[in-house]
Amino acid sequence: MHTNWQVCSLVVQAKSERISDISTQLNAFPGCEVAVSDAPSGQLIVVVEAEDSETLIQTIESVRNVEGVLAVSLVYHQQEEQGEETP
């Protein structure tokens, strides 16, 4: 059986005074992890993993809709199919 695996990284620009709250909210999303946050610049690097592109897109939209987020930029995306091939 094949499974699909998707991963992307995002640069999130946010209001600097809200970085801590935003990081907490993003880390609560399934498959979402704040890898780096820099309060003075208001930037976060976020890694998102999902089993399909629809879930990945929904998570990116959820990140975009968090209060205090100003912009979300996709900087990397990889998709792989995993599993055994059967004749």
From Swiss-Prot:
Compartments in which it is found: Cytoplasm
HAMAP family from the UniProt entry: NapD
Free-text function comment from the UniProt entry: Chaperone for NapA, the catalytic subunit of the periplasmic nitrate reductase. It binds directly and specifically to the twin-arginine signal peptide of NapA, preventing premature interaction with the Tat translocase and premature export. May have a role in the insertion of the NapA molybdenum cofactor.
InterPro entries, alphabetized: Chaperone_NapD_NO3_reduct
GO MF annotation, one: signal sequence binding
Protein name stated in the entry: Chaperone NapD
Entry's family note: Belongs to the NapD family.
An annotated GO BP: negative regulation of protein transport
Quaternary structure, from the entry: Monomer in solution. Interacts with the cytoplasmic NapA precursor.
Principal place of residence: cytoplasm
GO cellular component: cytoplasm
Pfam families the record matches: NapD
Disruption phenotype: Deletion mutant lacks periplasmic nitrate reductase activity, with either glycerol or formate as the electron donor.
UniProt xrefs under Gene3D superfamilies: 3.30.70.920
Keyword Cytoplasm applies: yes
